[in-house]
Amino acid sequence: MAAWTLISMLIIITVSDLKYMVIPDKVLLFFLPLIIIERIFIPLSPWWDSLAGGALGFGLLLLIAIISRGGMGGGDIKLYGVIGLAVGVKITILSFMIATFLGAVIGLTALAFKLIEKGKPIPFGPFIAAGTILAYLYGDGIISIYLSLFY
C-alpha cells in the first residue's frame, strides 16, 4: 500500500513539474497525511527512521537551495521532506544521489545537443521521482553492489 501511495504522488508531481515547472503544495498536503498514517501502521525499522528521513530530505534540499541561491525550488524541498517520511534515511540518500546523477546526465546531454539553453531551468521533479522509485525498488541491491566495489 505504501508503495502505491508514493508512486501515485510521484506520477502527479512528475506531470505537474514537466508541464508547469511547479510542484503544488496541494498535492504534497494531500499525500502527507496518507504517508504519515501508513508509517504509523506500517513503521520503518527503527521507528524513528521516517522522521529522520523527512528531516534529512527537507534539510538537505534546503541547504542546497541556500547555497545555490535559489537553484532548488521550494516544491523540490518539500517533496523530499515527504519522500523522506515515506522511505527513511537510507533510501532518501540513495534517491537523492540517483536523482542528481540522472538530472546531470540528461541535463548535460540536452545541453550538448542544444535541446535546452544554458541557464534555463529544468524541472527536477521527474528526476526525483525516477530516483525515488529506483531507490525504493532496488535500493538494497544498489547499495550492496556499490559497497562490494570498495569492501
Q: PLM ranges: what are they?
A:
Residues 41, 67, 112-113, 137-138:
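Helix-loop junctions at the membrane-solvent interface of multi-pass transporters
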Residues 36-39, 133-137:
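Aromatic-anchored segments of alpha-helical transmembrane domains
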Residues 20, 124-127, 138, 146:
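Aromatic side chains
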Residues 8-105, 145-151:
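Functional transmembrane core segments of multi-pass inner-membrane proteins
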Residues 109-134:
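Interfacial loop-to-transmembrane junctions
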